[in-house]
């Protein structure tokens, strides 16, 4: 454990084994990793493009309905084709799609690039906890999996869950008894698997969500930029 505590700055991570526990809000959580920042920017870009398309399409439609209605004397034009219009409504959507596809593809490629990590941790989903093994980097022994290992279980008092009269804590269903600790400004690779059913390793602030499937090893990665306590949860509705 002394090896872990030798980090100059740490980020602790608690993954609660409870679905849909996070407080709802209109936007994404503030990004705390490069990938999360890319996802956040991409989300905002596509949102504003969709809003612009919505305003343009419905604005044009309602303008035509109101200003060119039959009751004010307008008569519908009869025509079979308009080459200019057809070219425009083919090119414009293509340009818009390419404008969204390029940054989206770039972000997806970055999300999948788990090469050259500074630290590798195996995360195993159980009913009802997570197990962590530090396989490579700080916390491991000679780069093998006999380094630090721990189990992280939900720490929310049972009376808060089952008794409606008991007030919920600030981190209701997002608190664990033992946190996973990682260094900041280091690339952390997470290997996910499961012992029983499909789980999902989800940390919104890091832009990370990866299914943990029994019998399979899948991976994802993140780099924490600032020290702090970051909370995640199971992104599955089976609990």
Per-region residue spans from a language model:
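Non-transmembrane, membrane-proximal soluble domains of secreted or membrane proteins
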Residues: 22-45, 65-236
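N-terminal secretory/membrane targeting signals
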Residues: 1-22
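Alpha-helical transmembrane segments
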Residues: 42-68
